[in-house]
Amino acid sequence: MKRKAIFAILPVFVLGILITNAYPASKEIKQRMIARLPVIKALKGQGIVGENNRGYLQFVGQKKEKEEVVTAENKDRKLVYKAIAKQQGTTAAVVGKHRAVQIANKAQPGEWLQDANGKWYQK
């Protein structure tokens, strides 16, 4: 129960702090993620990608623009989730699922999200 509470209150900037202490290359990861953010926001706004229920970006249709950006973002998210999992004594999969809930709560209207059962919907 305590872990759920911890994950429920972790905003994006805290993820950066946690990863900074847990992973030597954290500054580079954070910088890369920040640099990709405008492209990711645009892809979400166009309905090309959404946030899946595991905390990763996923293409929601046939159109796959900027695939290298999506792949790089997911790779860095995986590193972040692993580092947080190590600190929290859990798994990267659990961290990702909790992060997916946080992302869904902060998503903009019209963005694609995947619910816990795998069904895609627009917020």
Specify the residue positions occupied by each region the protein language model found.
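Amphipathic, charged alpha-helical segments and their helix-to-coil junctions
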Residues: 26-68, 72-75, 86-123
